Every structure is written in structure tokens, then in C-alpha cells.
């Protein structure tokens, strides 16, 4: 298999990995340490991810407990969680921070599903852009005489197969996340 096809699959795989990460950050009404993955704390002047400053535990389905390694950073972590606008209210006793994840209303679930579909659509656009870039490169190579017309046709078909598989995988990820969100 040519380097171009390998490159195509690698780039498409990265897009799917990004989608998976984004979907993991969307809360389905259950506590999940990924909820805080995008939260950075201004710690001694440097933006630092919460995961590096504290251990994050999920003792119950709707409860996150954040135990900072440095107790003096509790207020900073709490402030960063508020600033991240996650739709949760952290409470602190000076030692640990507790976040109770609210149950999702039907309206909020539909809003999240809409957001999931948009993220999935963005991922599909990314995949199609990769396909277009690769096909343009293949046509350029054929025009320059680097590959034959038959090679162009077969590699274009391979790129299309990779695109179809990637879009199928994206659809499956989005569908699974929708089911997760809509299950009460």
C-alpha cells in the first residue's frame, strides 16, 4: 500500500481520536473525571491541568471528589472550575472539592445531543477535507507523471474506502454517545 494511503488513514485516525476525546468531555449526567480534562488552573503563574494538581475520584455516580496535592491550591482549582462554565457547582471544605453532577433535564439532554451531532458533523467535514487534499495531491502526481492513470484511479478508490470507513466510525461514535445521553 502506498505512503499516500497510509498518510490518509493516519490523518483520518487522528480526526476520529479528536472526536472521541471531545465526546468523552460531554457529560451524560454521570460523574466522570474527563469532565475536568479541559480545566486549567493558574498555578504559580503557569496554566496547569487540574489532573496534575489533584487526584480526581468518582465515589458515586453523580459525585466527583477532587483532592489537591497542595492544599493551598484548593481555592484556585475551585475558581478554575467555576470559570470553565461546566454547569456544575463545586463545593469545598478547604481540603477537598466536591462536585455534584446534576441530573440532566430532557431539554438539556436534547441540547447535548444537538451538540454531539454538531461535533460529529465537524469531524466528518475534517475527514472530507483530508480526502480532498489527498485526491488533489494524487491528481497533481498523475499530471507530473509520478503515477499512472490506473494508479490514480485505484488510489482514489482506496482513499474513498478509507473515507467511507472513517465516516461510518464517526456515525457509530455519535450514535453511541446519543444513546448514552438519552438513557435516563
UniProtKB/Swiss-Prot annotation:
<feature type="region of interest" description="Disordered">
    <location>
        <begin position="141"/>
        <end position="164"/>
    </location>
</feature>
<protein>
    <recommendedName>
        <fullName>Ribosome-recycling factor</fullName>
    </recommendedName>
</protein>
<dbReference type="InterPro" id="IPR036191">
    <property type="entry name" value="RRF_sf"/>
</dbReference>
<dbReference type="GO" id="GO:0005737">
    <property type="term" value="C:cytoplasm"/>
</dbReference>
<dbReference type="GO" id="GO:0043023">
    <property type="term" value="F:ribosomal large subunit binding"/>
</dbReference>
<dbReference type="GO" id="GO:0006415">
    <property type="term" value="P:translational termination"/>
</dbReference>
<keyword id="KW-0963">Cytoplasm</keyword>
<dbReference type="InterPro" id="IPR023584">
    <property type="entry name" value="Ribosome_recyc_fac_dom"/>
</dbReference>
<comment type="similarity">
    <text>Belongs to the RRF family.</text>
</comment>
<comment type="function">
    <text>Responsible for the release of ribosomes from messenger RNA at the termination of protein biosynthesis. May increase the efficiency of translation by recycling ribosomes from one round of translation to another.</text>
</comment>
<keyword id="KW-0648">Protein biosynthesis</keyword>
<dbReference type="InterPro" id="IPR002661">
    <property type="entry name" value="Ribosome_recyc_fac"/>
</dbReference>
<dbReference type="Pfam" id="PF01765">
    <property type="entry name" value="RRF"/>
</dbReference>
